[in-house]
Amino acid sequence: MSSGCSCGSGCKCGDNCSCSMYPDMETNTTVTMIEGVAPLKMYSEGSEKSFGAEGGNGCKCGSNCKCDPCNC
């Protein structure tokens, strides 16, 4: 059911690649980074692997500026 899925401006997937009604509308998010002194974590937990730049569901823009994969 990925026929309605398309990438927005800048070849970025629409609203978390959920085939939004307006794929060209981008959502701006403010992130606050708190830096401090902590031991370096040298292992990876399963929950951290799902976090990504496109909302954490592994969606990215593939060939011809189409969402790949698009989990609609």
UniProtKB/Swiss-Prot annotation:
Q: State the superkingdom.
A: Eukaryota
Does this entry carry the keyword Lyase? no
Question: Cross-referenced Pfam families, in alphabetical order?
Answer: Metallothio_2
Task: Kindly give the InterPro entries that the UniProt entry links to this protein.
Answer: Metalthion_15p
Instruction: Enumerate the GO terms in the molecular function aspect.
Output: metal ion binding
The UniProt entry's sequence similarity note says: Belongs to the metallothionein superfamily. Type 15 family.
Task: State the protein's purpose.
Answer: Metallothioneins have a high content of cysteine residues that bind various heavy metals.
User: PANTHER family from the xrefs?
Assistant: METALLOTHIONEIN-LIKE PROTEIN 2A, METALLOTHIONEIN-LIKE PROTEIN 4B
Official protein name in the record:
Metallothionein-like protein 1
